[in-house]
């Protein structure tokens, strides 16, 4: 269980000590599609980067169904530039630009945002109703998160404005410094690219480092996703991963809106009452 405290900032670099930053924004987009929420957030991020004087570049991966190859190709393209940071943002993530920019205030190698899973946490909704949470606030209590805290037992109290060490995080929102890939290059395998990339991230026969792959974790026999595999490889050589608990991210997905008319509560517009099939028709009596 995670208990968040709202307190003052800590661990933030002073302006004179901040290194020059140039960020490479990378988004895999299967089908070449992204959400409007992502687009709106990205435009605001661009304005925020310009206001801070942070140069940026962007690269997108279209129509690549294999997410491991998509991420590796984007990293391959990033390493050809002089950018200092790679920022993965998936095309179904909504974010606040100001909260994201706060990640740059901490000189950390790997930092990720924590976003909810694409499901409604009905247990949390029920609990919130019993606690008297107002109806207009219930949407803030519907999320399910996976937070992989490092070495904890029971309830942990952390500061909401301070990076939180985790053993793994999702690449749907992850900021990675260039030196991470440079160090991992010595320990991860390479493969020969045999896919035509219309976005120009990689050419045929390019040698691409496999930073992202699926793997089986020896200790638990779990199948690790590509982002957890990446985090494991980084931790194996002494690296650390941090989460940004101050970020409030949205994870856009599809949902079937359903219900039984006879069981729903009337809306403020006062829905008409529905009579059961065997009830007499008042108009005919």
In which residue ranges do the predicted regions lie?
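Anion (oxyanion) recognition and catalysis
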Residues: 50, 104, 234-235
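Short beta-strand-to-loop acidic/aromatic patch adjacent to the donor-nucleotide binding site
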Residues: 83-94
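C-terminal catalytic/acceptor-binding lobe
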Residues: 5, 14, 18-20, 24, ...
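Residue-level detector of anion-binding/catalytic polar loops
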Residues: 55, 92, 109, 240, ...
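Conserved catalytic core of nucleotide-sugar-dependent glycosyltransferases
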Residues: 75, 96-214
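N-proximal low-complexity "stem/linker" segments adjacent to membrane-targeting elements
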Residues: 2-65, 69, 281
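Active-site nucleotide-sugar/metal-binding loop of Leloir-type enzymes
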Residues: 72-85
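Conserved donor sugar-nucleotide recognition element shared by glycan-biosynthetic enzymes
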Residues: 67-71, 143, 227
